[in-house]
Structure formats: structure tokens, C-alpha cells
From Swiss-Prot:
UniProt keyword list: Cytoplasm, GTP-binding, Nucleotide-binding, Protein biosynthesis
Domain tr-type G: 9-278
Pfam families, A to Z: EF-G_D2, GTP_EFTU, RF3_C
Subcellular location as annotated: Cytoplasm
Name of this protein: Peptide chain release factor 3
SUPFAM superfamilies associated with the record: EF-G C-terminal domain-like, P-loop containing nucleoside triphosphate hydrolases, Translation proteins
Organism listed in the record: Xylella fastidiosa (strain M12)
Record's keyword annotation contains GTP-binding: yes
Family under the similarity heading: Belongs to the TRAFAC class translation factor GTPase superfamily. Classic translation factor GTPase family. PrfC subfamily.
Gene expressing this chain: prfC
Main subcellular localisation: cytoplasm
Gene Ontology molecular function: any one: translation release factor activity, codon nonspecific
Listed NCBIfam families: prfC (TIGR00503), PRK00741.1 (NF001964), small_GTP (TIGR00231)
GO cellular component, one term: cytosol
């Protein structure tokens, strides 16, 4: 067996998705704790304390206690290499989250036991559906009062349209929480509150009939549990690996991330059943992970991960072959070989140089402006990975400068932040305005904050009469030129040089489409098929 085949089989690359405040970042920490990657978990709640959550590393995130950039963390567990991608928890950062989901092979959905399925969870589930991503579910905050577990399973099935297969089942909830029972092994894991900051294994009974269990949880609770389990095992589906891998069934676990409870059964099950790196579609063929030659795509660019060095790092998912430190790779978009020196692996913002990487791994490439989101690297073959889109923004603002002498820094900052996916940046053909587009209001706050902190630019954003944007394309260059002349006041170029129609109203957009039937108007732009505009 080749090294690439063996190492690919060891990899598990996944993302954690949830509605804000479902406890995703806390669970991330506990997974790292069990993987031995960190010794002590930092409570996300202690926002003003010395210890902040390991995966919330940007200053703004530490101040607000929310994740607004995606972190990448790698740790070993039970002979496997786990690549965990933490996604932005705030609703405004959907696009960044979507691109993270293009780089993983499976996902873990976190649901708050008291709130059930929330709006953000529904949207993220739709994204996972597009690629049939296998999903496991962790119902969190079991140490608090919440919805009836049977009702929760019904809600997940009804709202998200995916079959539930419970793997662990709660014994009580809130103040009455006594533990969980594993429905596949019959093991009972007892809940011991207060042991939440260091790695711990709960007391385990081998079955519901084990001596001493009734004394620990109470005769009545044990009797109620037997009754409930009969009901749930009769009414719910059994775990089916094929259905799970096809994205049609989700194994469900219950626990409390903040108390470190129920996390280890989840991690053990994940390592055993989650898919290793899968094949990937490109514009020309399917790439298998076990191929010997390196391929990979960039799904994220992060500026200024190290404020002392003002650097930019491109996050590349390795799709096939083996990456070795300092190797040259073919950058398909520019048709040039680039030396991938000093590539990094991550523990959030802690970085280490990487000697080699295999399919499923995410590496950081130092980027001086030549690499963009969606770029493909190979060992010479011309191909581009598909399924890495940009979405048309819903909110627009004009950037205004307090100090006109800082225009150059503002343009540089906006260009870099748009390449990173923090915002979209448009330059109208007929004016010198700098227009920003976003999917949520928080993005403008983040951009203003980062412009000031990282580029020394004080900028304000004022409303502008734009309702939506569409990327425009036409096979016939003469027709496209005529369209440009007639609609020049509504046209702009984005940070990649693509032509974009900025519509003041939906009616205006509809009229423009009716008047130019040969022009294609796109609400998303696929990076693999990006078309340059002069």
C-alpha cells in the first residue's frame, strides 16, 4: 500500500456547524481536549478573563465572544488525524461558512436542547444538502432544561428532512441529568457535574442491568428509562452507515459540551464511521484522493493572522497526492509554478511549519497577493475544482474616508479583505466610489474594525441606492460591449476584475434582463469558471 493511500485512510476532515450560541466553539474546545491538543479548555463565557476560547483568535472575536473567521485545527486521536474546521457562528458570515463546507468530507451539527432547530441551522443544512455531506448531530446543553428528546428528534426529521438514528440517549435533563446510555453498546455513562476543565472519563456501567446502577440513578428513573428506550427503539431508525454516508441519515448524540459530557462517545464514533477524504469534481475530470500527484484548492484567505508580520495566508485543502515542504506546484489560474515554501499547519492562530501533508489536510500558504479563493494547485495538470462560489450580496455601502491621504491604504485594505471573503468590493465604471457588499450588517462592523486595526484607516460606510448585484457574462464580445455602453452607469468590476451589474431596484434588474436576453445574469459566481473582464 502506498504512503498516500495509507495516510488518506487515516484522515477525517470535518466542520462544526450550528446556530449562534448553540455551544459550537465550546464543543470544539472539548474535542481538542480529548484529542490531547490542549491541556485546559478556555471558557468562552469569560470574555474578559485571561483565557479565551482557543478557536476564537481574532481580537474582535475575543471582545464579542463570537466566531467571525474560520479556524483550522489538526490533532491526532486513536491513530487517526483529525482536521477540524471551526466555522463562523454569526449569521452574517454565511459565505465564509459555505466555502469551509466545500473543504470538508463531513459535518457535525450542534443543536441547543432548549431551542431545537433554529434558522441558521436550516440554512447550513441546505448547503450540506447541495453536496450530500454526511452529518452527525450533537444535541448540546443537556445540563439545562430543554425540549423532550423524542420531540427534538421529530423536529430534526420534520424541519431538516433527514432521518435521525439516536446513538446515545439522555438519562434525565437539567438538574435531573444522570447520564446517557449508548444504544449500540448498552453502556451507561454517568454524569458528574463540576469536572469540566480537564480531560475526564465519566463512570461507565456496562449495561442497564449492571449492579450498582439503580443505586446511582434511582430505581424510578431506571424504570422510566427502560420504558422510554422501548418506545424510542421501536419508533426510530437504527444507524445505517450507508444512509449516513449518503447524507440521508444523521446519528444523534446527547451531551453537555461545557461539562465535557457525552463528547468522548461522539468522538470515538466519529473516528470509526466518518468518511476519509473523498473524490472531488473538477472542470475536466474526477480527482481521486489516492492519486500520487498533488492537487488542492484554496477555500479561504486570511489576512494578518500575525499582526507583527502583516501576512496573508491562503488555506489550501489537499485533495490528492502528497505535499512536501518547499515543493513547487503549478498555479493553474496564472499558469505559473509557485514554490510553496514555509507552509503551515494550524491550531487556530498557533502555527507550525509543515514537513508534509496528505489528502484531507489543510495547509496555509504564505500569499503575497497572487493566490485567490478558488485557485487550484497541481503538479502541472490544468484542472479547476468546482463548487466554490461567491454569492450576490444583499446589503451595500459606500466607503468614506476621514483622511483623503489614506485612500491607497483603504483600497489595499478593501482589496485584501474582499479576497479573504470578509466582504465584497466593487468599483463602479463611471465613478471613483468604493462600494462594499455584504450578506449581513455585522460584516460592515468587522471591516471597519479591521481597516482601523490592521491598516490604520478610519472609514465610515454610508447607505447607497443599490439593492442587489449580478455577475454578467456573454459569449459574444460585441453584444457584451453594446450592453456595457448602454448600462455603464450601473456596471462595476469586483475585486477579481469580473463585470457586475449593480441594480438600484429589483424592477430595474428585471428590466435590464428583459432588454438584454443574450446577457447572462448570475446571482453566484463559480470560482472555477471565473471570467476576466478588461
Amino acid at each position: 500500500m502506498s504512503e498516500v493511500v495509507a495516510e488518506t485512510a487515516r484522515r477525517r476532515t470535518f466542520a462544526i456547524i450550528s446556530h449562534p450560541d448553540a455551544g459550537k466553539t465550546t464543543l470544539t474546545e472539548k474535542l481538542l481536549l480529548f484529542g490531547g491538543a490542549i491541556q485546559m479548555a478556555g471558557s468562552v463565557k469569560s470574555r474578559k478573563a485571561v483565557r479565551h476560547a482557543t478557536s476564537d483568535w481574532m481580537t474582535l472575536e475575543k471582545e464579542r465572544g463570537i466566531s467571525v473567521t474560520s479556524s483550522v485545527m489538526q490533532f491526532p486521536y486513536e491513530g487517526k488525524i483529525i482536521n477540524l474546521l471551526d466555522t463562523p457562528g454569526h449569521a452574517d458570515f454565511g459565505e465564509d461558512t459555505y466555502r469551509v463546507l466545500t473543504a470538508v468530507d463531513s459535518a457535525l451539527m450542534v443543536i441547543d436542547v432548549a431551542k431545537g432547530v433554529e434558522e441558521r441551522t436550516i440554512k447550513l443544512m441546505e448547503v450540506c444538502r447541495l453536496r450530500d455531506t454526511p452529518i452527525m448531530t450533537f444535541i448540546n446543553k443537556l445540563d439545562r432544561e430543554g425540549k423532550n428528546p423524542i420531540e427534538l428528534l421529530d423536529e430534526v426529521e420534520r424541519v431538516l428532512g433527514i432521518q435521525c438514528a439516536p446513538v446515545t440517549w439522555p438519562i434525565g435533563m437539567g438538574k435531573r441529568l444522570r447520564g446517557v446510555v449508548n444504544l449500540l453498546t448498552n453502556e451507561v455513562h454517568l454524569y458528574e457535574p463540576g469536572r469540566n476543565f480537564t480531560r475526564q472519563d465519566s463512570t461507565i456501567f456496562t449495561s442497564l442491568e449492571a449492579p450498582g446502577l439503580a443505586e446511582r440513578i434511582g430505581e424510578q428513573m431506571l424504570a422510566d428509562l427502560h420504558e422510554e428506550l422501548e418506545l424510542i427503539q421501536g419508533a426510530s431508525a437504527c444507524f445505517d452507515p450507508t444512509e449516513y454516508l449518503g447524507g440521508r441519515q444523521t446519528p444523534v448524540f446527547f451531551g453537555s459540551g461545557v461539562n465535557n459530557f457525552g463528547v468522548q462517545p461522539l468522538l470515538d464514533f466519529f473516528v470509526e464511521h466518518a468518511p476519509s477524504p473523498q473524490q472531488r469534481d473538477t472542470t475536466s475530470r474526477v480527482v481521486l484522493p489516492t492519486e500520487e500527484k498533488l492537487t488542492g484548492f484554496v477555500f479561504k484567505i486570511q489576512a494578518n493572522m500575525d499582526p507583527q508580520h502583516r501576512d496573508r495566508v491562503a488555506f489550501m485543502r489537499v485533495c490528492s497526492g502528497r505535499f512536501t515542504a518547499g515543493m513547487k506546484a503549478f498555479h493553474v489560474r496564472s499558469s505559473k509554478d509557485l514554490k510553496l515554501a514555509n507552509a503551515l499547519t494550524f491550531m487556530a492562530s498557533d502555527r507550525e511549519s509543515v514537513a508534509e501533508a496528505f489528502p484531507g489536510d489543510v495547509i496555509g500558504i504564505h500569499n503575497h497577493g497572487r493566490v485567490s479563493i478558488g485557485d487550484t494547485f497541481t503538479e502541472g495538470e490544468v484542472l479547476s475544482f468546482t463548487g466554490i462560489p461567491s454569492f450576490a450580496p444583499e446589503l451595500f455601502r459606500r466607503a468614506c474616508l476621514g483622511d483623503p491621504l489614506k485612500l491607497k491604504q483603504l483600497q489595499k485594505g478593501l482589496t485584501q479583505l474582499s479576497e479573504e471573503g470578509a466582504t465584497q468590493f466593487f468599483r463602479p465604471l463611471m465613478s471613483n466610489d468604493l462600494i462594499l457588499g455584504a450578506v449581513g450588517m455585522l460584516q460592515f462592523d468587522v471591516v471597519a474594525y479591521r481597516l482601523k486595526n490592521e491598516y490604520g484607516v478610519d472609514a465610515t460606510f454610508e447607505p447607497v441606492s443599490i439593492t442587489t448585484a449580478r455577475w454578467v457574462y456573454c459569449d459574444n464580445s460585441k453584444t457584451l460591449e453594446e450592453f456595457r455602453e448602454k448600462n455603464v452607469t450601473n456596471l462595476a468590476v469586483d475585486a477579481s476584475g469580473e463585470l457586475v451589474y449593480l441594480a438600484p431596484t429589483r424592477v430595474n434588474l428585471q428590466l435590464a434582463q428583459e432588454r438584454a436576453p443574450e446577457i447572462h445574469f448570475f446571482a453566484t459566481r463559480e470560482h472555477a469558471y471565473a471570467v476576466g473582464v478588461d
